[in-house]
Design a protein with these regions (language model features):
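A surface-exposed, glycine/aromatic-enriched loop/edge motif typical of exported proteins
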Residues: 275-307, 399-437, 487-511, 644-679, ...
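Outer-membrane beta-barrel transmembrane domain signature of Gram-negative proteins
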Residues: 179-181, 320-345, 424, 496-599, ...
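Solvent-exposed loop/turn elements at secondary-structure boundaries
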Residues: 554, 569, 635-703, 720-757, ...
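Short loop/turn motifs that connect adjacent beta-strands in outer-membrane beta-barrel proteins
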Residues: 255-261, 274, 349-350, 389, ...
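Surface-exposed, extracytoplasmic segments of Gram-negative outer-membrane nutrient-acquisition systems
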Residues: 503, 684-692, 726-756, 788-868, ...
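Flexible loop and strand-edge segments within Gram-negative outer membrane beta-barrel domains
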Residues: 274, 318-358, 362-369, 375-442, ...
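Short, small/polar-rich motifs associated with maturation and membrane association
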Residues: 2-378, 391-393, 776, 850
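Outer-membrane beta-barrel transmembrane strands
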Residues: 332-349, 358, 395, 442-494, ...
Length: 1011
């Protein structure tokens, strides 16, 4: 079930140390109101009021979103503060003070106080990109100098209400393909950068948090300072064997120098509902459907008599004639979640700090609450100026996650779907545990079979030291960092197997008569499992950047790193050995007057996955750029076209996570070999020893050759357009040989670096922001990504028919029959190519592609697309008028297909009680009076022909979704001041509110044939 947030209650308050009792009580009262944000206002003492005033306000970005972390400096007194997470600030200054507002990537804003106590600020992006900073691999670069394909997600656009950060990505950034496969609350999304480029073991991007490889979903959205996606070779080659699938870079929040302590708190209550709850056939629909299918097989005889149907429907004897809506009995229509986040940030000349704690709880979707999870977490980021140019950084975090589920959580869903409404009561009226003759009772699975508890703990630490050598060599810095991360997982399963019964009738006294169908036990059986690992990482680097003659800008990076990961609970001796990587990386950049740009990157990396002579690889990239808008001749039209930059890159990147059936594929492994003996012991022959797995001393990493061509355009300092074309050829994909001649004498096929694949496409982003007047502001943004991949080689034997070959087609291309409609007469069946099984009138008819008179797997052809969308897009807007604001965002996917079928579409051939189907199927299956029905004939047996993958049961899973929407109103300042607070904002917001799709049975984003 996809979840959506229909209503949410938030409360934010800052600087609470000076609150009066009255103000505290007021905040507690307001915290019970929905969608309310509150910030407390300090009460200055009497002596301060005589010489100073308290100035406060809110800082917004170009999208009219709150901008946290903005530095506010009182120029005369040098006092400083920073904005909280909702962009609010408060500072006590002289009435004639001058305030300077600054933030990375935005123009400095200097205002005179002139006795004003309320000063709202709108920050504008740098009209020139000369000073804007972008996070790149192992550092930062000036935005103007960046010629790699890098996409950033503004912090204000990150939905802080999500529990898994991966669920934020869909439709938000050009080049990102993200889908949420599971509908279970609390689950994350799968995502790829520019789609899938390999059919090898690892196609997921590298995720780095503060430069350390970590799980994206462990990052609290509240803690994020910057979020960037690195897409092309120039941006990722520096990561060598880890960068082939793209890189996600996240930096976490830090304290600001010159800021007094600011305490921010956020509490949130959310109501979550499924985007689409499946509708199954009710009792009457099922019995009518089953009677038709039964009569079709039994020469007109019906299974349910009119008298029996009446008893099931009128409820006269619910023990023997039950009528249960299992979806309503097992699942709730909605559930809730709660979140609390508190952080403290500040800084002085010596120390800057950011400390945060959070708690998230999500209640279950079952009746009653049988499944829930909670997730307390903490983080801290401390910068200490040991000396004038020496900074020590300490970054600590811990995430603890607990999930509680029914014991049979996986099978509960399908049993709830498939169990027919008239199969069995939840329990018999005398309390006897009920179970059908075949299958199980969903109520028992939820309430009587035990439970699972899953505990996960992630402890992460990072310590770094930065030395600035600029007093001696301008622009030179050194950095060293070390991290230690520990992951621990525990699973406790307490299962129970109760004795169950099935009522067969009533005796003369009217009491139920039972047959015992399961001899169970009344005690809990304990099963437990533990997993864990620890990871260390060491990095040392030198960076340099300087400007010569006000024209030549030169930069460089040289870095060494090493990483080791050890399994705490290995399954074998081989798995107990640490996983190790090490290497060096470098970057050289040059620009002339910010017009012409050249950049080179390299990674020289080693992995112990490979043989000693093949462990290290060199991965270079090069890029050029030309910002024509900085030419002198461009000046006359610079007010129209303010930025125009062309860029191109090419490089080679690696992937050492190649998979295979063994860890050290370069080593041969010996095994017992049947077929010959090596002596005897006690009269019993001893098997000989031979090569079980042949070693491959040439095993190596995958190589990705990437090319990117892009253009950046900005018009009238308000409309930005970025477009990139990309092409990638992946080679050396580690795959099992398709066939090895028997004369070679090996028991298994070896793995070799043989596979090849191509991926290409285009991604683009558009932004527009405009302040129309003092009352109206508008911002619009959108992005689009298209990619298509295809297999070039996979070492499989050539198909017996060219149309069956997977080479030249997308990875995981769907195959099936071409459906020609339904058989309408017996003569049509007799005069058609032989179909699957024994088709009947109303069954599907398939095309005989090869013309041999038989429809079989030789007639499979490529149909539709794949389950991963080729088209991904998103667009939205923020509009504000005075104290009112509206925001919305749409997300969509296209060129994606899937098959429907299985137990929720086709009735069971073996278990009548496990034969329920979707209501849409029950109302739209083929009958003589419905010759053009949506679904083929339903049958209690002999319908194999209708279950094969084909164009008939393949569906278009494209959709467009209203991903988020919010309407807000901010009370006037005068009203707030009378209440003793600085800001009150009422709003209504929601997530996943509307979905537009041709597919109606369930949420089209769910990758499942049954729902």
């Amino acid at each position: 079930m996809r979840t959506c947030i229909d209503n949410r209650k938030r409360k934010v308050f800052n600087d609470i140390k000076h609150l009066s009792t009255k103000a505290v009580l007021l905040i507690i009262f307001l915290s019970l109101l929905p969608a309310l944000q509150v910030m407390a206002m300090e009460t200055p003492d009497e002596t301060q009021q005589k010489s100073t005033i308290r100035v406060q306000g809110r800082v917004l970005d170009e999208f009219n979103q709150p901008l946290p972390g903005v530095s506010i400096l009182a120029v005369k007194s040098t006092k400083g503060v920073i904005t909280d997470i909702d962009g609010n600030y408060s500072i006590e200054v002289a009435p004639d003070e001058k305030l300077e507002f600054s933030y990375i990537g935005y123009q400095k804003n200097v205002v005179l106080v002139n006795g004003r106590k309320d000063i709202p600020i709108k920050m504008e992006p740098l009209t020139s990109e000369l000073k804007e900073v972008t996070v790149v691999g192992y550092g930062t670069q000036r935005k103007a100098s960046v010629i790699g394909a890098i996409t950033g997600l503004p912090v204000g656009k990150i939905n802080r209400s999500v529990n898994k950060l991966s669920n934020v990505l869909a439709g938000q950034m050009a080049g990102v393909v993200a889908v949420q496969r599971s509908g279970e609350p609390g689950e994350g999304s799968d995502f790829w950068i520019r789609g899938v480029s390999t059919f090898g073991a690892n196609n997921r991007p590298l995720v780095l948090v503060d430069g350390i490889e970590r799980d994206l979903n462990l990052v609290d959205p509240e803690d994020i300072e910057t979020f960037s996606i690195l897409k092309d070779a120039t941006a990722t080659a520096i990561y060598g064997v880890r960068g082939a699938n793209g890189v996600v870079l996240i930096t976490t929040r830090k304290g600001k120098e010159g800021s007094k302590p600011v305490i921010s708190a956020r509490a949130e209550f959310s109501i979550l509902q499924p985007t689409k709850m499946p509708k199954m056939a009710n009792a009457q629909e099922f019995m009518e459907m089953y009677n038709f299918a039964y009569a079709d097989n039994k020469n007109g005889e019906e299974f349910y008599s009119p008298e029996a149907m009446a008893k099931y429907l009128n409820g006269s004897d619910p023990d023997l004639y039950p009528n249960i809506n299992w979806m309503d009995e097992i699942y709730k229509n909605s559930t809730t979640s709660e979140r609390v986040n508190i952080n403290v940030t500040g800084g002085s000349e010596k120390v800057k700090y950011y400390v945060a704690g959070s708690y998230y709880k999500e209640n279950g979707v079952f009746r009653p609450d049988k499944g829930l999870g909670y997730n307390p977490a903490s983080s801290s980021n401390l910068d200490i100026n040991l000396f004038k140019n020496t900074v020590l950084n300490i970054n600590l975090s811990n995430q603890y996650d607990v999930k509680k589920q029914p014991n049979n959580n996986a099978s509960l869903w399908i049993y709830t779907f498939k169990t027919i409404p008239i199969a069995i009561p939840k329990k018999y009226s005398d309390g006897t545990v009920a179970r059908p003759t075949i299958g199980d009772n969903p109520y028992n699975l939820l309430n009587l079979n035990g439970y699972n508890e899953l505990f996960t703990n992630n402890a992460q630490s990072l310590i770094g030291l930065t030395q600035d050598f600029s007093p001696w060599i301008k622009g030179l810095k050194a950095n060293i960092k070390f991290s230690w991360d520990a992951y621990n997982y525990a699973h406790l399963n307490r299962s129970k197997n109760p004795s169950t019964y099935y009522a067969t009738g009533r005796n003369e006294d009217g009491n139920l008569m039972y047959t015992k169908n399961n001899d169970g036990n009344d005690y809990l059986v304990l099963y437990k499992d533990n997993k864990g690992n620890r990871t260390t990482y060491l990095e040392a680097s030198l960076t340099y950047e300087n400007l010569f003659a006000n024209a030549h800008r030169v930069g460089g990076l040289f870095l060494f790193n090493m990483r080791e990961k050890t399994d705490n609970f290995p399954d074998s001796y081989i798995m107990s050995l640490p996983y190790r990587n090490q290497g060096i990386a470098g970057r050289v950049t040059y620009s002339y007057k910010d017009r012409y740009f050249i950049e080179g990157n390299f990674g020289y990396n080693g992995s112990e996955n490979f043989a000693p002579k093949k462990r290290f690889g060199f991965f270079p990239s090069a890029a050029i750029g030309y910002m024509i808008s900085n030419e002198a001749f461009w000046e006359p039209i610079s007010h129209i076209v303010s930025v125009l930059k062309f860029k191109g890159s090419y490089g080679i990147i690696g992937n050492d996570q190649i998979g295979g059936n063994r860890r050290f594929a370069f080593n041969s492994e010996m095994a017992d070999v049947n077929g010959y003996t090596f002596g005897t012991t006690g009269g019993n022959p001893i098997s000989g020893i031979g090569t079980g797995y042949p070693g491959n001393p040439y095993v190596s990493w995958e190589e990705a050759k990437k090319m990117n061509i892009g253009v950046e355009l900005e018009l009238y300092n308000s409309l930005k357009l970025n477009v990139d074309y990309f092409h990638e050829r992946r080679s050396g994909i580690f795959i099992e040989r398709g066939a090895v001649p028997s004369v070679v004498g090996v028991n298994v096929n070896p793995y070799l670096n043989l596979g090849e694949m191509e991926n290409k496409g285009v991604d683009a982003s558009l932004e527009y922001y405009k302040t129309i007047n003092k009352d109206w502001n508008i911002s619009v943004r959108g992005n689009f990504t298209y990619n298509r991949n295809k297999k070039l080689y996979d070492d499989q034997p050539s198909a017996n028919y060219p149309y069956k070959d997977v080479i030249g087609k997308p990875w995981n291309q769907q195959f099936g029959y071409i459906a020609l409609g339904y058989f309408r007469t017996e003569s049509e069946i007799q005069n058609s190519p032989k179909q699957i099984g024994n088709p009947r009138v109303g069954d599907l008819k398939y095309k005989d592609i090869n013309g041999d008179g038989i429809v079989d797997t030789d007639d499979y052809v490529a149909i539709g697309r794949t389950a991963i969308p080729e088209i991904n897009y998103g667009f939205g807007a923020n509009i504000s008028y005075k104290d009112f604001d509206v925001a919305f965002f749409f997300q969509g996917i296209g060129n994606v297909t899937g098959f429907i079928g299985g137990e929720t579409i086709d009735m069971s051939d073996t278990n009548q009680l496990f034969s329920n189907v979707y209501q849409d199927v029950a109302l739209n299956y083929w009958r003589p009076d419905r010759p053009n029905a949506k679904y083929p004939r339903l049958a209690i047996s002999g319908s194999e022909n209708n279950k094969a993958p084909s164009t008939h049961n393949q569906v278009d899973k494209s959709f467009m979704r209203l991903k988020s929407a919010e309407i807000g109103y901010t009370l006037p300042k005068e009203v707030c001041h009378k209440m003793g607070i600085s800001l009150v904002r009422f709003y209504v917001s929601g997530t996943n509110l509307l979905t537009f799709s041709k597919f109606k049975l369930w949420d089209p984003e769910i990758d499942n044939s049954q729902g």
